[in-house]
């Protein structure tokens, strides 16, 4: 008979949030394992190691992790300087992974393929909560099954496809050799692929901004380099940030992009909902309905992220049907409702799944399809959860978080989603009709309830489900990049998974 309380806590993913979770577990003296699919820590962060983060070091460090590192002689970086993704790994994540209380618990090339309850499928409810978790893992020596008293899924998110309907556009899979998802290093390791090429960037978030500016720089150095940009919205009004942003690097990024647009360094295509790609003798042609964009050689897909829920299919999760975040968290982060202020601090109580106690999705993945995740938010999540697992409910319920006053949206404007000046006259009729349609909020039918119809002064969002709150404008296209990421595969600004 397995005694569940003697089993380790399993953390899935050795990115920033997974490693900080390990630090808290170590500090609390709880046994744990960290299972990482890649050959090293922070596999996803390494994909954007060239990118400078929007947040200075003092936003990017966790106090408990810092305490563990300091005890080993670690010296903190300048708190006001801005690290690149590579520096974030080298100065913080790698030393943390080498800590003697953490290193023995790391398992690399251990890809988790399924999580469930030992001896119980999804339909089996008898004594479910009393059973340990069974974690199926593909290892270098074959498939294994590990048992755990609790599981923290910090495995991050996966890129959205180009297709405007939520699935890959027709022809997208056939063109994958010419598509990069996230934020390629066009001035460094990926330069040869983009030099002298015609490139289309799809998406309107900060990762798209960074790639566009790098391509503009490349075009100054490499003749024949042409930069195209496709966005869903018909207007960029209010989309390029504010110099009043408490994260000034984020505000400056949008201002630099505005200058590049004014100088005609970028060919902007508005109102593009990608539905088809076709490879021709002139290049790849992207279609939005009957509209065809000019042929290009390469495409950068910066259309946001979503959680990979496949490995969780045998768990009884209470997820919002739209945002795909825990039901107690979803209303606070849903871009259809969330204005551009800060997300309320949250921890174990908001992240608990009532029918699967001691299972938690944390980090970027916990936000589902919402784009406003910050590293600090993830650190607070795992601090609260680990305190609860240790039985310290006073600490678990205590709020220990400060976010930028300008919020995760990055602008000085803080008002209800979709103010009148955010929507063109042409969009108004469609938008108003959409706004009064009720939306189903909660995952399971036993907890189903309808969200009240959105009553917003002025025209509402121009798309049936706006998918982000960013840059002082909550009403944004789904084809946008997260404000920041560390665990996801895009440009890492201040967040992680």
Give residue ranges: language-model regions.
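N-terminal Rossmann-like FAD-binding beta1-loop-alpha1 element of flavoenzymes
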Residues: 7-34, 201, 208-218
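Short hydrophobic core segments
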Residues: 12, 35, 146-158, 202, ...
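Glycine-rich active-site loop/strand segments that organize a redox cofactor
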Residues: 40-91, 182-188, 227-248, 357
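Feature captures the FAD/FMN-dependent oxidoreductase FAD-binding
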Residues: 75-150, 155-159, 268, 275-286, ...
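Glycine-rich dinucleotide-binding loop and its adjacent helix/turn
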Residues: 85-88, 153-221, 227, 323-333, ...
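A Rossmann-like FAD-binding core segment of flavoenzymes
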Residues: 114, 216-320, 387, 393-405
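Active-site substrate-recognition segment that forms the wall
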Residues: 198-238, 252, 346-370, 374-389
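C-terminal, flexible cofactor-proximal segment of oxidoreductases
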Residues: 270, 306, 321-497
């Amino acid at each position: 008979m397995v005694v569940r309380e003697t089993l380790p806590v399993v953390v899935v993913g050795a990115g920033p949030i997974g490693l900080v979770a390990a630090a808290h577990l170590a500090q609390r003296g709880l046994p744990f394992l960290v299972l990482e699919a890649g050959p090293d820590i922070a596999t996803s962060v390494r994909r954007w190691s060239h990118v400078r983060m929007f947040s200075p070091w003092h936003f990017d460090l966790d106090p408990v992790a810092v305490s563990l590192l300091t005890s080993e002689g670690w010296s903190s970086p300048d708190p006001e300087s801005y690290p690149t993704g590579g520096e974030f790994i080298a100065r913080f994540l790698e030393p943390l992974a080498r800590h003697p209380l953490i290193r023995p618990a790391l398992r690399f090339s251990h890809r988790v393929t399924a999580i469930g309850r030992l001896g119980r499928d999804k339909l089996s409810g008898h004594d479910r909560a009393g059973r340990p978790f069974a974690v199926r893992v593909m290892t270098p020596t074959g498939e294994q099954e590990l048992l755990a008293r609790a599981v923290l899924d910090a495995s991050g998110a996966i890129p959205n496809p180009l297709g405007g309907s939520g699935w890959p556009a027709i022809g997208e899979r056939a063109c994958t050799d010419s598509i990069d998802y996230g934020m390629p290093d066009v001035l460094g390791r990926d330069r040869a692929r983009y030099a002298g090429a015609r490139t289309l960037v799809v998406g309107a978030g900060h990762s798209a901004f960074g790639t566009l500016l790098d391509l503009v720089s490349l075009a100054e150095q490499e003749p024949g380099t042409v930069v195209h940009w496709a966005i869903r919205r018909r207007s960029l009004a209010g989309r390029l940030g504010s110099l009043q942003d408490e994260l000034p690097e984020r505000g400056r990024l949008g201002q630099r992009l505005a200058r590049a647009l004014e100088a005609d360094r970028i060919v902007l295509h508005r109102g593009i909902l990608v539905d088809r790609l076709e490879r021709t003798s002139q290049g790849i042609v992207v279609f939005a309905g009957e509209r065809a964009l000019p042929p290009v050689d390469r495409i950068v897909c910066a259309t946001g992220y979503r959680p990979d829920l496949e490995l969780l299919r045998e768990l009884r999760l209470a997820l919002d049907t739209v945002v795909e975040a825990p039901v107690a968290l979803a209303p606070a982060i849903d871009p259809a409702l969330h204005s551009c202020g800060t997300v309320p601090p949250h921890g174990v109580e908001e992240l608990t799944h009532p029918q699967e106690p001691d299972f938690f999705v944390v980090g970027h993945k916990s936000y589902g399809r919402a784009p406003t995740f910050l590293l600090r938010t993830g650190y607070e999540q795992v601090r609260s959860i680990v305190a609860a697992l240790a039985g310290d409910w006073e600490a678990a319920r205590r709020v220990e978080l400060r976010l930028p006053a300008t919020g995760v949206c990055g602008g000085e404007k803080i008002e209800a989603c979709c103010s009148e000046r955010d929507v063109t006259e042409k969009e108004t009729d469609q938008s108003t009709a959409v706004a009064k349609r009720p939306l189903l909020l909660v995952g399971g039918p036993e907890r189903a309830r309808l969200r009240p119809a959105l009553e917003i002064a002025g025209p509402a969002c121009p798309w049936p489900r706006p998918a982000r709150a960013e840059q002082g404008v909550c009403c944004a296209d789904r084809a946008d990049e997260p404000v920041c990421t560390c665990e996801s595969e895009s440009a890492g600004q201040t967040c992680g998974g």
